[in-house]
């Protein structure tokens, strides 16, 4: 599930727009994607190597009512992910580690650098902004409160992410919630319907039981027709799933004779949570992959929240690990240009400040929209890069609202709103240790689909959000704030987030190894089985690192050849 964002709105001067609620004041700007991509943020902190976590970031003392960590280690996908991780640590140590320049310190870039370091190489990680994380970045406001690019959920069906936490020794930073999916009931304001997965049953029986036990959202005839519609996917396996890439969710359901109410009751919410778009746009392959992971693994749909802000609680431990093995991470280092050799390979990277960075190999782990802006003209006619035109980031808005009181009609869990404009939300003052507050609620909400709203003012977005919240909290929230009052809010706009998983995108997703010798890609849009998600980003980084390790001899010869050519020129 891709409940994440990418880029916060930035000022024309390059700073981040921080939003505070103030009556009569709303002069913050919304930007189109072309106005956001590639802007360099000017922050005078050149390296992360001199920064260490504060004691507060290391030990969070608040005790929350979380569930025990599920037993994931026996799952086939977890074991496969663990084996891939181990292959880097056990690979033959190189005589001299490759210097690999990795652009982008989101999860894909961090993963690439981490596993290259595990294999004995020296990654140089470059991030254009002043903060680690990419789509999971977060910032602290003047009051010391954090606001994030998205609402980040860690599933049991994320084997590479779960292995990563274990490898870093930070499993305890995931706050596992009860194994349930909770949906708001639009026709019954203030009420919710649950799908509870019993711990005593194995998969897929626990999921089937959860569906059968819920009689508030689907009738028995609807459940039967939905099950019959899914039979081809169960029988046909992966080949069938891949063949559905050409259909939207809505088209597939009509072909299979699934009632429209199944779409209205379940798949609108699921589509928006997975890719921030509605079922009439989303590829059915995306839904089938998610259902397969959730139903075939006992703990696949079990959810966890990170216990604090992602840059400190997840990204910084990865950077510390990379640096401990000889790699380095550099912030405020925007890639300006990819300079080429006469043969079309990469000569070096030119940064926004004019500095030149050279390496034995080069990785771009930035979002696909940024990559397309950076592609040298000489590469644009190559089919591998031409196919990227089909991949476009989807807009999303993340909203944080601090209220003057503790809301009662909420759960210690992720909640699906089933609202036309809101996707999912959580009361972070309850679900997350670092954001815990016994007296006031902080709701974090994903506003999607956001295409029609991305350029609107913050006040318009907050006004519409409050109208939707009044339906979820009819006794506690009113659109005019006559009940709970807003203390402050932050609105984080992401014009281009994860790639839009529309039909026929799958053939356009590139392999991590490009046809350009020594040049590689990482990102959830690249070819890997988990689509647009945190899991997909981490796996793409591992596959990218694997390709580089496999190409070691070739890359060494290439570097020696380049050095010889330079000496000859001199």
UniProtKB/Swiss-Prot annotation:
Its membrane topology is listed as: Peripheral membrane protein
Primary location: plastid
Kindly indicate whether the keyword Chloroplast belongs to this entry: yes
Q: What Enzyme Commission number(s) appear in the record?
A: 1.3.5.5
Tissue specificity annotation: Expressed more strongly in flowers than in leaves.
Keywords, A to Z, come to: Carotenoid biosynthesis, Chloroplast, Chromoplast, FAD, Flavoprotein, Membrane, Oxidoreductase, Plastid, Transit peptide
Q: Name one GO cellular component term.
A: membrane
InterPro entries to which the protein is assigned, alphabetical:
Amino_oxidase (IPR002937), FAD/NAD-bd_sf (IPR036188), Flavin_amine_oxidase (IPR001613), Phytoene_desaturase (IPR014102), Zeta_carotene_desat/Oxidored (IPR050464)
The biological pathway it contributes to is: Carotenoid biosynthesis; lycopene biosynthesis
Q: What does this protein do?
A: Converts phytoene into zeta-carotene via the intermediary of phytofluene by the symmetrical introduction of two double bonds at the C-11 and C-11' positions of phytoene with a concomitant isomerization of two neighboring double bonds at the C9 and C9' positions from trans to cis.
The protein here is known as 15-cis-phytoene desaturase, chloroplastic/chromoplastic
Q: Which organism is it from?
A: Narcissus pseudonarcissus (Daffodil)
């Amino acid at each position: 599930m891709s409940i994440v964002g990418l880029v916060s709105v930035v000022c024309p001067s390059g700073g981040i727009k921080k939003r505070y609620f103030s009556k009569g004041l709303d002069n913050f700007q919304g930007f189109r994607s072309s106005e956001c991509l590639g802007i360099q943020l000017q922050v005078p902190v050149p390296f992360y190597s001199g920064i260490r976590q504060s004691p507060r970031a290391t030990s969070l003392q608040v005790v929350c009512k979380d569930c025990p960590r599920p037993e994931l280690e026996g799952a086939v996908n977890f074991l496969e992910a663990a084996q891939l991780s181990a292959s880097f640590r056990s690979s033959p140590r190189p005589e001299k580690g490759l210097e690999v320049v990795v652009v982008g310190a989101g999860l894909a870039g961090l993963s690439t650098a981490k596993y290259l370091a595990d294999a004995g190489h020296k990654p140089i990680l470059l991030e254009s902004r002043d903060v680690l994380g990419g789509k999971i970045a977060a910032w602290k406001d003047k009051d010391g409160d954090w606001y994030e690019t998205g609402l980040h959920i860690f599933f049991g069906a994320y084997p590479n992410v779960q292995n990563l936490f274990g490898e870093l020794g930070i499993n305890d930073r995931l706050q596992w919630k009860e194994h349930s999916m909770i949906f708001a009931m639009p026709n019954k304001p203030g009420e919710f319907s649950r799908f509870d997965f019993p711990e005593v049953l194995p998969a897929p029986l626990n999921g089937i039981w959860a569906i059968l036990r819920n009689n508030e959202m689907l009738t028995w005839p609807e459940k039967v027709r939905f099950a019959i519609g899914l039979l081809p996917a169960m029988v046909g396996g992966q080949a069938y799933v891949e063949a559905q890439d050409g259909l939207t969710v809505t088209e597939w359901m009509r072909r299979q004779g699934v009632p429209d109410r199944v779409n209205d009751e379940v798949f609108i919410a699921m589509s928006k949570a997975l890719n921030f778009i509605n079922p009439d746009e989303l590829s059915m392959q995306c839904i089938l992959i998610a259902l397969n992971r959730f139903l075939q693994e006992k703990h696949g749909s079990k959810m966890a929240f990170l216990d604090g802000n992602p840059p400190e609680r997840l990204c910084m431990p990865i950077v510390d690990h990379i640096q401990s093995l000889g790699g380095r991470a550099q912030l405020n280092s925007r890639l300006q240009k990819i300079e080429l050799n006469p043969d079309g390979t990469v000569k070096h990277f030119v940064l926004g400040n004019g500095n030149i960075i050279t390496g034995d190999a080069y990785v771009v782990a930035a979002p696909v929209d940024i990559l397309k802006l950076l592609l040298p003209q000489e590469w644009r006619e190559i089919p591998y890069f031409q196919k990227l035109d089909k991949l476009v980031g989807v807009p999303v808005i993340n909203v944080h609202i601090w209220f003057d009181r503790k809301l009662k009609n909420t759960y210690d869990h992720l909640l699906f709103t089933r609202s036309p404009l809101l996707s999912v939300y959580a009361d972070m003052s309850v679900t997350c240790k670092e954001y815990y507050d016994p007296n006031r609620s902080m709701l974090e909400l994903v506003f999607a689909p956001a295409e029609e709203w991305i350029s609107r003012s913050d006040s318009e977005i907050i006004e519409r959000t409050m109208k939707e919240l009044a339906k979820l909290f009819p006794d506690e929230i009113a659109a005019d704030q006559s009940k709970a009052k807003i203390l402050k809010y932050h609105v984080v706009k992401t014009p281009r987030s994860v790639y839009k998983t529309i039909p026929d995108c799958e053939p356009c997703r590139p392999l991590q190894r490009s046809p350009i010798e020594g040049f590689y890609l990482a990102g959830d849009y690249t070819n890997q089985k988990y689509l647009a998600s945190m899991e997909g980003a981490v796996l793409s980084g591992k596959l990218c690192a694997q390709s580089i390790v496999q190409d070691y001899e070739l890359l060494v010869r290439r570097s020696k050849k380049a050095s010889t050519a330079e000496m000859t020129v001199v």
